[in-house]
């Protein structure tokens, strides 16, 4: 992809400074930009590393002339501009048009004329795939699955039977969609059930054997969802598991059976959402956050990294810690924990003082 810097500025809806005819063929970090590359220097610390005579993406308020640049694009929101810039120069996964001869496609499957399907892809009976689909090598798609328009499915993705996927969905390598939920039951009350009711007390420990509850529900992924590498979303037991429009899921995330995740959520790496949990819209779960089963996390909740949510979380709450509490409560608690050694020393000193007074008989 090659653009003039003026064309790139227009694409980003940003202000151009300097020579708009310069050719841009890529981007690089400040101090590493070569010929034809625009340097990313949206903070003063990065701007100091710029080489004179080049091109840069700068935050509004920077002085390109003082930095010795030939041209610059000035933006009000640098990270949003980064989204547009990286999109302009992303070559994509390079999946060749057409259907690779090694692909195994059931004759009842419906594929678009413009499909790009890589080597060793397996597509099952009655699958329907929308226009513009790009499917990389070693992907398997189970029977009766429906995939919308402009899907990008990277290598090694596994999609089980009866999954419904919307338009413009991106699935990164190793994603697993629609596997059976983790549902098991014992003939008698299990130890897990007992301690959940008693909050830790056990009457007796006895043998128990697990019986599988089969997963008859489906999985519904809405439009514009992105799912990171090696993440898994299980199908429902009776009703469908659902992921809402525009939600982005990072690598190594587990979403359990029957879960409902709302629209425009962010689930960062190593998040685990247990079965039948419901998550509202625009929720952000930081890395390693855990959500207990059968609870509700309200709209616009933000949970910091490694937070463990065991009970319902009201809308708009900012959470941190294990168990999850308001962020300000957690921060204050951590401050108090750091004060404990000093407090311990003060108490020890007071005890010693009182002991001396008692020994001298000055205190009754």
UniProtKB/Swiss-Prot annotation:
Oligomer and partners: Homotrimer.
Database matches in SUPFAM superfamilies: Trimeric LpxA-like enzymes
Reactions the enzyme catalyzes: a UDP-3-O-[(3R)-3-hydroxyacyl]-alpha-D-glucosamine + a (3R)-hydroxyacyl-[ACP] = a UDP-2-N,3-O-bis[(3R)-3-hydroxyacyl]-alpha-D-glucosamine + holo-[ACP] + H(+)
Pathway entry: Bacterial outer membrane biogenesis; LPS lipid A biosynthesis
Protein name, per record: UDP-3-O-acylglucosamine N-acyltransferase
Keyword Lipid biosynthesis on entry: yes
Gene Ontology annotations of biological process type: lipid A biosynthetic process
Signal peptide: none
Family membership noted in the UniProt record: Belongs to the transferase hexapeptide repeat family. LpxD subfamily.
Claim: Cell wall biogenesis/degradation is one of the keywords in the record: no
Keyword line: Acyltransferase, Lipid A biosynthesis, Lipid biosynthesis, Lipid metabolism, Repeat, Transferase
Source organism: Paracoccus denitrificans (strain Pd 1222)
PROSITE patterns associated with the record: HEXAPEP_TRANSFERASES
Active site: 257 (proton acceptor)
EC number: 2.3.1.191
Coiled coil: none
GO cellular component: membrane
GO molecular function list: N-acyltransferase activity
């Amino acid at each position: 992809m090659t653009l003039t810097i003026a064309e790139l500025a227009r694409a980003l809806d940003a202000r151009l400074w300097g020579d708009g005819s310069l050719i841009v063929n890529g981007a690089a970090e400040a101090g590493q930009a070569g010929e034809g590359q625009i340097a990313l220097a949206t903070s003063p610390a990065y701007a100091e590393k710029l080489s004179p005579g080049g091109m840069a993406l700068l935050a509004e308020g920077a002085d390109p002339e003082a930095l010795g640049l030939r041209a610059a694009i000035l933006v009000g929101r640098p990270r949003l501009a980064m989204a547009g810039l990286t999109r302009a120069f992303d070559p994509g996964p390079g999946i060749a048009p057409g259907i690779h001869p090694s692909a195994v496609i059931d004759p009842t499957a419906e594929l678009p004329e413009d499909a790009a399907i890589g080597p060793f892809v397996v597509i099952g009976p009655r699958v329907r795939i929308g226009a513009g689909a790009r499917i990389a090598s070693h992907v398997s798609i189970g029977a009766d699955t429906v995939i919308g328009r402009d899907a990008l499915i990277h290598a090694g993705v596994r999609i089980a039977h009866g999954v419904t996927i919307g338009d413009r969905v991106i699935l990164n390598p190793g994603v697993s969609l629609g596997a059976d939920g983790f549902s098991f039951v014992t003939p008698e009350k299990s130890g897990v059930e007992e301690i959940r009711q008693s909050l830790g007390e056990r009457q007796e420990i006895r043998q128990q054997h697990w019986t599988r509850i089969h997963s008859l529900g489906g999985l519904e992924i809405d439009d514009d969802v992105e799912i990171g590498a090696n993440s898994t979303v299980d199908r429902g037991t009776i009703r469908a598991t659902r992921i809402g429009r525009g939600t982005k899921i990072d690598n190594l995330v587990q979403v359990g059976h029957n879960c409902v995740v709302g629209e425009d959520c962010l689930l960062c790496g190593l998040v685990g959402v247990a079965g039948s949990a419901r998550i509202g819209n625009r929720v952000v779960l930081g890395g390693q956050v855990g959500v207990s089963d059968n609870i509700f996390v309200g709209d616009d909740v933000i949970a910091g990294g490694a937070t463990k949510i065991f009970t319902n979380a009201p809308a708009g709450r900012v959470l941190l810690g294990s168990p999850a509490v308001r962020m300000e409560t957690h921060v204050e608690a951590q401050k108090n924990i750091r004060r404990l050694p000093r407090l311990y020393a003060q108490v020890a000193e007071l005890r010693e003082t009182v002991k001396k007074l008692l020994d001298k008989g000055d205190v009754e």
